[in-house]
Regions:
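P-loop (Walker A) phosphate-binding loop of NTP-binding proteins
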Residues: 10
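Conserved beta-strand scaffold positions in the cores of enzyme catalytic domains, especially
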Residues: 28-30, 102-106, 151-156
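Glycine-rich phosphate-binding loop used to anchor ATP phosphates in small-molecule kinases
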Residues: 53-102
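A glycine- and Lys/Arg-enriched "phosphate-lid" helix/loop adjacent to the NTP-binding pocket
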Residues: 45, 96-144
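NTP-dependent small-molecule kinase module
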Residues: 25, 140-159
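Conserved substrate/cofactor phosphate-moiety recognition/catalytic segment
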Residues: 13-74, 120
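Hydrophobic anchor at the beta1->P-loop junction of P-loop NTPases
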Residues: 7
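Walker A (P-loop) ATP-phosphate-binding motif of ABC ATPase nucleotide-binding domains
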Residues: 4
Length: 159
């Protein structure tokens, strides 16, 4: 039976790197939010409000695609941040709609480690988006640690 793999972690915690690993390990289709946003909305995402508006549009199209892939027997790794209760409810709903199991991979790293990785990532210039320290702080304030009480199967990663 196919599985939906979800990712939860602060900015620069390693979600996309883990998504690539999981995709290879599970012969899964990997769908990543950042490249979609960068390609569909070049130069339009200048604030968190812009991100939320554009991300919501993508999710409206992506949801049925993910459910269809899962129903067709394809493992899926969604490199979309499952960092808030609302996001996790939407993502979990995709697995439920397809009638398949899920696994939420939680990258548990402290803010200092993530911020250092963000600075290194920004210096290399290879990521679709370069968050500032202020954006990191703003987005991190909304981060909510996942809980099994949400109906989630959680695998914790600490590196």
């Amino acid at each position: 039976m196919p599985t939906l793999h979800l990712l939860c972690g602060k900015i620069a915690s390693g979600k996309s790197t883990l998504a690539s690993t999981l995709s290879a390990e599970h012969a899964a289709m990997r769908l990543s939010e950042d490249p979609w946003l960068a390609q569909l909305y070049p130069g339009e995402i200048l604030s968190v409000a812009d991100y939320l508006r554009c991300a919501q549009r993508i999710r409206g199209v992506l949801g049925p695609l993910v459910v269809g892939l899962l129903e067709s027997g394809v493992n899926v790794v969604l490199d979309f941040p499952a960092n808030t209760l609302a996001n996790r409810q939407w993502l979990l709903g995709l697995a439920q709609a397809a009638g398949v199991p899920h696994c939420l991979h939680y990258l548990e790293l402290d803010d200092d480690t993530c911020r250092a990785r963000l600075h290194a990532r920004n210096a290399h210039g290879e990521h679709d988006f370069a968050a500032t320290d202020a954006e990191f702080d703003l987005i991190t304030r909304h981060f909510c640690v996942p809980s099994e009480e949400e109906g989630l199967v959680i695998e914790v990663h600490r590196s």
